[in-house]
Amino acid sequence: MLFSSLTFVWFFLPALALIYYLAPGRKIKNAVLLIASLLFYSWGEPRYVALVLLSILFNYLFGLAIGKAGGRKGLRRAALAVCVGANLCLLGYFKYFNFFLELAYTVLGKEGFTPRNIALPIGISFYTFQAVSYIADIYRGVKPVQKHIFRLAMYISLFPQILSGPIVKYNELEPQIEGRRESISMHAYGIRRFVYGLAKKMVFANMFGQVVDRIWGLPLEQLGTAVVWFTILLYSLQIYYDFSG
């Protein structure tokens, strides 16, 4: 489910907003956001929701271990190294296993390399580095250990940034999970920002993208120097408005 899709704009977001504002108290509201985030993720990758939950549980337990280690630096460093290493190995397996396997075949002079069918889970880079940020912050003492697993789950899996980022440091987002301020003016500002971003994506980025695709589809002999430079300019604008939106 994309933020620019009709399903998100006309169904998911309005339903979430209604349920959120009807929910009493911060704990219930946070539970609504957490459930919505997992549903949002499962829309595109239902089989990998378990991987997100496993990542949350794993980093939660190692966070507790680092906290219980207290002043024992060696134990804290060992827990940090194992936790960060496991996170990066998981990410590396999905992203680079075939690359390193092919490299090994090449180095050993073997033939017949067949890539393994390993689907890359959506957003795994973002939620993995979010988890690493949490572990790094509590190791450095920037923030205390999060003893409430559901709050940590919100930080790692929050739907506005789990699919395409940005990666937000734990010490920046944690105060908003536990004690965020809300007002009509802030909600209105958020709606305006969302509408502006949606317009940049749907109107400008998509428009420039359609023109670029049509030009690149022309025969090579029809692509003069001026046309190529014009297309490069349009493509730059497409990328700008896509990321800006």
Describe every region a protein language model picked out.
Residues 1-244:
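Membrane-embedded transmembrane alpha-helical bundles that form the catalytic cores
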